[in-house]
Amino acid sequence: MKGKFITLEGIEGSGKSTSLEDIANTLDKKSIDYILTKEPGSGSLGNELRSLLLSSDNKISGEVELLLMMADRKNHLDSLVIPNLNNGIWVISDRYLDSTYAYQGGGRKMDVALIDELSSSLNLLAPDLTILFDLPVEIALDRAKRRASLDRFEKEPIDFHNRIRDIYKARAE
């Protein structure tokens, strides 16, 4: 049996990471084999890219950010997601392709056609289910600020986060 690929999407502080625990508990009760993962940042390459992408010390252009995200995603799919799905294991990912449309397309105002082209060229897998966590930006950012330190994305101005939320909502319709 092929596993299921479920992605969790939403702005910073929307509750994705917290909800992973609830999903894991439900799958445990149903005796379903699963792994929890995240983007960016699964595996050694992913962890390195995550550090580069989230560090406030790095000034990265939107184009470079997009290419690094897509490189991480392709590696994540090939090395972790697809092998587990083929072994019947469910994969629950904190972020996936919708985050690129939201953050780079909406937040960074990049051409969505470029994201479409990269996605198609890389033959990216479509999730079986995507769950969007939506709440007002002000509330989500307030929740994110309660963490130990803010990353490069969390420090962006509120209009950046409003554009991200708008794209998420549009993609969910």
PLM segments and residue spans:
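Hydrophobic anchor at the beta1->P-loop junction of P-loop NTPases
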Residues: 6-8
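A glycine- and Lys/Arg-enriched "phosphate-lid" helix/loop adjacent to the NTP-binding pocket
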Residues: 99-166
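ATP-dependent small-molecule kinase phosphotransfer cores
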Residues: 26, 30-123
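Walker A/P-loop
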Residues: 17
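ATP-binding Walker
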Residues: 13-14
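Phosphate-binding P-loop
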Residues: 1-3
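Post-transcriptional modification and biogenesis factors for structured RNAs
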Residues: 171
